[in-house]
Amino acid sequence: MGIRAIVVDTAGTTTDLNFIQDVLFPYSVKALPDFLEQNQHNVLVENCICDTKDIALEPEADLARVTEILQQWVNEDRKATPLKTLQGLIWKQGYAHGEFKGHIFPDFIEAVKRFSTQNLRIYSFSSGSVDAQKLLFSHSDGGDLTEMFNGHFDTRTGNKLDKQAYCNILNTISLSPKQVLFVSDVIEELKAADAAGMMTCQMVRDSKQRTGDFRKISSFDELQIE
C-alpha cells in the first residue's frame, strides 16, 4: 500500500518554536488592542469577540476586557479558535508590512520539494489557524511554499491531542490510516495519531526533548519514503 501522504506539525517540526513564541505571539499581544478597536465591526472579528465572551463566560465583557482575556490566552498558549483566528488576521498584516518572515527549517524546505517529486501529498496540522499556516508558508524565508501543500488543518478539525482529529483528517483526504504518515515533535499528538491508525514519526530537534516509543528523526533529511 505504502505512504501516500505526509501530515506535518508546524511548531517544533517545520518551524522553530522560538519563532512562534518570541516573534509571532508577542506581536499579536501588542497588536490586539488597536486591531480590535479598528476592526470590531468586521463580521469575522465581531464573531471572534462574541465567541471569546462565550468561552470566558463573560457575556457582558466590554472590548477592553475581551482584549485582556485574549492577551491572557496568548500567555497561557490557549488553543481557543477565536484567538487563533484573530492571531491569523493580525499576522497577515505583519507579513504584509514586512515586519517578519515565516521561519521554516531548511531541511523541510528541501524535503517538501523532494516529496512533491515523489507524488506524495503534503498537509499541515496546527493549532494555528489555516490562514496563519498559509501565511507562514507563503512568506517563508525559503520563499512561497504553498504550492507544495495539498491542504491545511487547524482546531476546527479537532484537538491535536484527540484521536478523533486524526480520524477527521483521514476522512477528509480519503486515505486509509496506513497510507498517511504524521510527523510531530509532541508525544501526545503522536499517540493520538497512532490511536487513529496513522503511521507516526517523532521529530527530535532538541537533545533535551521528551521522546517516546516512536520512530525518530532529527531532520527531514533523514525521512526517506520508499
From Swiss-Prot:
Keyword Amino-acid biosynthesis: yes
Highest taxon listed in the record's lineage: Bacteria
Pathway: Amino-acid biosynthesis; L-methionine biosynthesis via salvage pathway; L-methionine from S-methyl-5-thio-alpha-D-ribose 1-phosphate: step 3/6; Amino-acid biosynthesis; L-methionine biosynthesis via salvage pathway; L-methionine from S-methyl-5-thio-alpha-D-ribose 1-phosphate: step 4/6
EC number: 3.1.3.77
Entry keyword set: Amino-acid biosynthesis, Hydrolase, Magnesium, Metal-binding, Methionine biosynthesis
Needed co-factor(s): Mg(2+)
Any one GO MF annotation of this record: 2,3-diketo-5-methylthiopentyl-1-phosphate enolase activity
InterPro entries named among the record's database cross-references: Enolase-ppase_E1, HAD-like_sf, HAD-SF_hydro_IA, HAD_sf
First-level EC class: hydrolase
Cofactor binding description: Binds 1 Mg(2+) ion per subunit.
Catalytic activity: 5-methylsulfanyl-2,3-dioxopentyl phosphate + H2O = 1,2-dihydroxy-5-(methylsulfanyl)pent-1-en-3-one + phosphate
Annotated CDD domains: HAD_EP
Gene Ontology terms: biological process: L-methionine salvage from methylthioadenosine
Pfam families named in the record: Hydrolase
Record-annotated disulphide pairs: none
Entry function: Bifunctional enzyme that catalyzes the enolization of 2,3-diketo-5-methylthiopentyl-1-phosphate (DK-MTP-1-P) into the intermediate 2-hydroxy-3-keto-5-methylthiopentenyl-1-phosphate (HK-MTPenyl-1-P), which is then dephosphorylated to form the acireductone 1,2-dihydroxy-3-keto-5-methylthiopentene (DHK-MTPene).
Family note: Belongs to the HAD-like hydrolase superfamily. MasA/MtnC family.
Subunit structure: Monomer.
PANTHER family assigned to the protein according to its UniProt record, in alphabetical order: ENOLASE-PHOSPHATASE E1 (PTHR20371:SF1)
Protein name, per record: Enolase-phosphatase E1
Species per Swiss-Prot/TrEMBL record: Shewanella putrefaciens (strain CN-32 / ATCC BAA-453)
